[in-house]
Amino acid sequence: MGKTYSSPVNPIPKAPKGLAIHHWLNFLQAAYRLQPGPSEFDFHQLRKFLKLAIKTPVWLNPINYSVLARLIPKNYPGRVHEIVAILIQETPAREAPPSAPPADDPQKPPPYPEHAQVEPQCLPVLHPHGAPATHRPWQMKDLQAIKQEVSSSAPGSPQFMQTVRLAVQQFDPTAKDLHDLLQYLCSSLVASLHHQQLETLIAQAETQGITGYNPLAGPLRVQANNPNQQGLRREYQNLWLSAFSALPGNTKDPTWAAILQGPEEPFCSFVERLNVALDNGLPEGTPKDPILRSLAYSNANKECQKLLQARGQTNSPLGEMLRACQTWTPRDKNKILMIQPKKTPPPNQPCFRCGQAGHWSRDCKQPRPPPGPCPLCQDPAHWKQDCPQLKADTKGSEDLLLDLPCEASHVRERKNLLRGGGLTSPRTILPLIPLSQQRQPILHVQVSFSNTSPVGVQALLDTGADITVLPAYLCPPDSNLQDTTVLGAGGPSTSKFKILPRPVHIHLPFRKQPVTLTSCLIDTNDQWTILGRDALQQCQSSLYLADQPSSVLPVQTPKLIGLEHLPPPPEVSQFPLNRSASRP
């Protein structure tokens, strides 16, 4: 079954996309001449055909209806053939020169001269006394004067509309003139919005009917460009001015809302600035008095607000607010001099630190000298904290003594999850000191004192010893040994060990910089070389005890139940020293 089309609700169907309004009005006038009248189905087929015809290269302006009739397919549904045939019949009559006098001069006797087709003008129209209407070019000084008057006004504001309306009345511009004036005065966005609103107003005016407007002679914009069509030109000018009042966004202009009264500005001057800003920012027709009264109180300074609140005139008429604040004058602010303490004059005596006069010792820029020689290197020129021997070499990374096999990826991921989901601290590479379960923790080191060459020696790593022990043969001959008491595993000892209050340097195989100790114990019997916790803490190293593979002991069936069949337990020698030294 075919589609059912009801009677049109809107008597004026919408024009197809891409077709000018005046062309669509020509098709509508021809369609309404059909007997019987057209249906909605006829308008639907007409719009469908025109959409296809617009895309063809034969679509011209003005339209050649004879060529257009050839594009209609045979047996095309609807009454499109009849509508185009009516337009073909009306075309010669419309193109014929007028045989009647123009409406502006009905008293002119015949014969009437044939008016040649005038090209659309783009300049203001001049109406000299006793002469036909002509055009003259826009002068730059006129355009600049108009733009200077509206430069501080928003498009659509009362001051803007007043200036533009006076310019339109003085120059009597055509449609093309108004378009050029809009491009010169406003931005591209405002011009685009104005053009859209103007097209809507023109479509409504052409539909309702305008005195002297002929739809077959072209759109209103083209007819308004004719100097002789003064009535149509006035109608187009009114529509062009009305399009400014419907521009969106003019009421949201925040320039006038940000005007504040200064702390010393008179209230009358502040209200005058508000009044000018509202004239330039508010669109035409918007009530200005309520906004002006509200801003005059809310944007005033605190002193004027207190005066208006005390008199109950926060929302009174503007004249009463001006009279209330008329007697107010800015307060005189006395300048207060800041009292500053007088500086103590510099002394005439020399500084106790640098020996120069002109400043106190507390203001001296020379650093304080050390009280004595450095206890590490015996240099009297610097403090102990500035000793170069304490400054570690942070540029180079320390080498590992032992390369351990890397863990498997799944083991490392499981550890990261247990330690906090993979969040790790910055990497720090520590040297590893390997130990053996079968041997004592022995490490080959080199020991040196000030102005002596390093001497190699085998040292025992003892984490239980508080202080490092060195044999007596490594001690320099001029050393000043002091008596001390050492508490070890065998009890206190007072004669076996001496303390050496002298810096000693221990070179480890896994460090580039030596470990410097301020003092150490000297074994007078030349028996022990022990690295205590004082040296190991400076190493920042880790002790590594390798896992030994498990071994299966041969077990024979015992004849008797007991432990006689098992081998004797291994004998492990104990560490010979676990002592603490007390320094004098």
From Swiss-Prot:
Record motif PPXY motif, residues: 109-112
EC number from the UniProt entry: 3.4.23.-
Compositionally skewed regions (Pro residues) per UniProt: 98-113
Any single Gene Ontology cellular-component annotation: viral nucleocapsid
ZnF (CCHC-type) intervals: 349-366, 372-389
UniProt motif (PTAP/PSAP motif) ranges: 98-101
A GO molecular-function annotation: aspartic-type endopeptidase activity
InterPro entries named in the record: Aspartic_peptidase_AS (IPR001969), D_retro_matrix (IPR003139), Gag_p24_C (IPR045345), Peptidase_A2_cat (IPR001995), Peptidase_aspartic_dom_sf (IPR021109), Primate_lentivir_Gag_pol-like (IPR050195), Retropepsins (IPR018061), Retrov_capsid_C (IPR008916)
Residues the UniProt record annotates as site (Cleavage): 123-124, 337-338, 430-431, 553-554, 561-562
Domain annotation Peptidase A2: ranges: 457-535
Superkingdom in the source lineage: Viruses
Region spans: Disordered: 93-117, 564-584
GO terms (BP aspect): proteolysis; symbiont-mediated suppression of host gene expression; viral translational frameshifting
Pfam families per the UniProt record, alphabetical: Gag_p19, Gag_p24, Gag_p24_C, RVP, zf-CCHC
Polar residues bias (residue ranges): 575-584
Lipid attachment site numbers (N-myristoyl glycine): 2
Modification(s) after translation: Specific enzymatic cleavages by the viral protease yield mature proteins. The polyprotein is cleaved during and after budding, this process is termed maturation. The protease is autoproteolytically processed at its N- and C-termini.
Active site positions, chain numbering: 462 (for protease activity)
Keywords carried by this UniProt record: Aspartyl protease, Capsid protein, Eukaryotic host gene expression shutoff by virus, Eukaryotic host translation shutoff by virus, Host gene expression shutoff by virus, Host-virus interaction, Hydrolase, Lipoprotein, Metal-binding, Myristate, Protease, Repeat, Viral nucleoprotein, Virion, Zinc, Zinc-finger
Quaternary structure note: Interacts with human TSG101. This interaction is essential for budding and release of viral particles.
Domain free text: Late-budding domains (L domains) are short sequence motifs essential for viral particle release. They can occur individually or in close proximity within structural proteins. They interacts with sorting cellular proteins of the multivesicular body (MVB) pathway. Most of these proteins are class E vacuolar protein sorting factors belonging to ESCRT-I, ESCRT-II or ESCRT-III complexes. The capsid protein N-terminus seems to be involved in Gag-Gag interactions.
Function, as annotated: Matrix protein p19 targets Gag, Gag-Pro and Gag-Pro-Pol polyproteins to the plasma membrane via a multipartite membrane binding signal, that includes its myristoylated N-terminus. Also mediates nuclear localization of the preintegration complex. Capsid protein p24 forms the conical core of the virus that encapsulates the genomic RNA-nucleocapsid complex.
Name the record gives this protein: Gag-Pro polyprotein
Source species: Human T-cell leukemia virus 3 (strain Pyl43) (HTLV-3)
Gene it is expressed from: gag-pro
